[in-house]
């Protein structure tokens, strides 16, 4: 595989191949697999009964409001002579109401969240990165030049963070150092979350932690249970090896748990560990994560309690998960392995961008019927049917997702995918600003990047009541996952936001 001059991303990491066309993200809106359209409409029809009840209830309320006192008296007299029918209908109404209330999905609210801000002492500038890489003496001249070019074109700024163990010469990627990094990130985010929300940790009923490349024993979730003395019956989950899309997977899992367990809180912690996952070899396909991945993590508090609606920031509307792991190329395109010298790292396939495009296409095709206005759906469906039935060369209609969402949080895994999504979804620079600035300020923080992006939008004062947010992330496996939120209020940034002391400097102009 040839050295990269320009990074592109898929599943959190970037690479350039010899073939420029294969490197680019395919225009996934130009070809649509019908099974994903059907899946999206299946989700829509699942809620069709509830949608039909809305106009029926409106008509019923209107008619009742027109009744006079004489009308009500006549109805009462009629019921007196039909007591059996009255009792039967009353019982039926009570039974139907009970079944509806018991079976309807519980609302899931995002009370608050926090993103970890590392100390300034852990910041790494380009020159410091290159100087340390030379001093380590594990990299040859070709590898050093390759990393320099990746850094210059990556979209990362001069204020990203690396763990303390990698600031040492030589680095000390020990188990103890890796544990220390995870504790600093997770506990730092959780301390802020509990302080801001005034939640007692023992009130947490569900805990979900995701970290792709570091899975010690006891687990990261067990470390949190031990640190905050969570109650003995907490439902604890630890997700590993699921890549940069695992943050949305964790939200989806927590949502499902909150459907089962009433009146409880769920905490989701999304992080990655850099200390033990630095590559010290010379295989270019495995060097790119060194240039992109940086320290970061987030903690999110979810609730299914009705009383929490007033103080919550968002309500979860949809989660859509797409997995292409059944395809061998997709399964192998981001693969942790050892090189010829026994050095461990993440290897990237030259087909990675094409696979990312297929996963994205499948995901948004399923999501579309759930979120797009009916006018967009009709236009999209008509052009699709015309093309399928008449084998027409008619150019497919590209739905305008800007009509469905006010804000976009695209996983900040790399500059190239942000560029391609901006182009294919016809987004403005403002729509992708949060993703670009998060990549510049914090680098690729893996599954937590979408939360730094949401914090950026809030810090800019752009999140208004009723605004809809689309979080989209993708990662190894190969997976593409989406979460849709609606703002319940004009959202203000949380106390100790990661952008608190630098938001006035952004957006910055990026020159490549």
UniProtKB/Swiss-Prot annotation:
The active site is at residues 244, 323, 407, 411, 440, 444. Disruption phenotype: No visible phenotype, but significant reduction in C24 VLCFAs and accumulation of C20 and C22 VLCFAs. InterPro entries: 3-ktacl-CoA_syn (IPR012392), ACP_syn_III_C (IPR013747), FAE1_typ3_polyketide_synth (IPR013601), Thiolase-like (IPR016039). GO terms for biological process: fatty acid biosynthetic process; response to cold; response to light stimulus. The chain crosses the membrane at residues 44-64, 83-103. It holds the Pfam family ACP_syn_III_C. The keyword Metal-binding does not apply. Its main location: endoplasmic reticulum. This is 3-ketoacyl-CoA synthase 9. The gene is KCS9.
């Amino acid at each position: 595989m040839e050295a990269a001059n320009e990074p592109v991303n898929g599943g959190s990491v970037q690479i350039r191949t010899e073939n420029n066309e294969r490197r680019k993200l395919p225009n996934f809106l130009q070809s649509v697999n019908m099974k994903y359209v059907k899946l999206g409409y299946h989700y829509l029809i699942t809620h069709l009964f509830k949608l039909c009840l809305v106009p029926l209830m409106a008509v019923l309320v209107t008619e009742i409001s027109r009744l006079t006192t004489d009308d009500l008296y006549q109805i009462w007299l009629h019921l007196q002579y039909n007591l059996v029918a009255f009792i039967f209908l009353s019982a039926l109404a009570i039974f139907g109401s009970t079944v509806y209330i018991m079976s309807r999905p519980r609302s899931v609210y995002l009370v608050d969240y926090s993103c970890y801000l590392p100390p300034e002492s852990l910041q790494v500038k380009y020159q410091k990165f290159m100087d340390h890489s030379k001093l380590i003496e594990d990299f040859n001249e070709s590898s050093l030049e390759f990393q320099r070019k990746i850094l210059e074109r990556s979209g990362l700024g001069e204020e990203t963070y690396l763990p303390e163990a990698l600031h040492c010469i030589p680095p000390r990627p020990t188990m103890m150092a890796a544990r220390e990094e995870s504790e600093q990130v997770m506990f730092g985010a959780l301390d802020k979350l509990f302080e801001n929300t005034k939640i007692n940790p023992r009130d947490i009923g569900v805990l979900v932690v995701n970290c792709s490349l570091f899975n010690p024993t006891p687990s990261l979730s067990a470390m949190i249970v031990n640190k905050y003395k969570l109650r003995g019956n907490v439902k604890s989950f630890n997700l590993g090896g699921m890549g940069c899309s695992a943050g949305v997977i964790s939200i989806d899992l927590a949502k499902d748990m909150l459907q089962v367990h009433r009146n409880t809180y769920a905490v989701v912690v999304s992080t990655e560990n850099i200390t033990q996952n630095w590559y010290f070899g010379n295989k270019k396909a495995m060097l790119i994560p060194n240039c992109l991945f940086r320290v970061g993590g987030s903690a999110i508090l979810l609730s299914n309690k009705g009383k929490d609606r007033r103080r919550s920031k968002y309500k979860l509307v949809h989660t859509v998960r797409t997995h292409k792991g059944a395809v061998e190329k997709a399964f192998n395109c981001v693969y942790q392995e050892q090189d010829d010298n026994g050095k461990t790292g993440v290897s990237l396939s030259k087909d990675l961008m094409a696979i990312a495009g297929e996963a994205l296409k499948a995901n948004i095709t399923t999501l579309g019927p759930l979120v797009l206005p009916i006018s967009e759906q009709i236009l999209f469906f008509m052009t699709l049917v015309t093309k399928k039935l008449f084998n027409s060369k008619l150019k497919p209609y590209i739905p305008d997702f800007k009509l469905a969402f006010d804000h976009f949080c695209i996983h900040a895994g790399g500059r190239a995918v942000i560029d391609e999504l901006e182009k294919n979804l016809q987004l403005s620079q403002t729509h992708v600003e949060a993703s670009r600035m998060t990549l510049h300020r914090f680098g690729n923080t893996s599954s937590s990047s979408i939360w730094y992006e949401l914090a950026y939008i809030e810090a800019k004062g752009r999140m208004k009541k009723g605004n809809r947010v689309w979080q989209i992330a993708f990662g190894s496996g190969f997976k593409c996952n989406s979460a849709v939120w609606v703002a319940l209020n004009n959202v203000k940034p949380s106390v100790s936001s990661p952008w608190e002391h630098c938001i006035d400097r952004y957006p910055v102009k990026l020159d490549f």
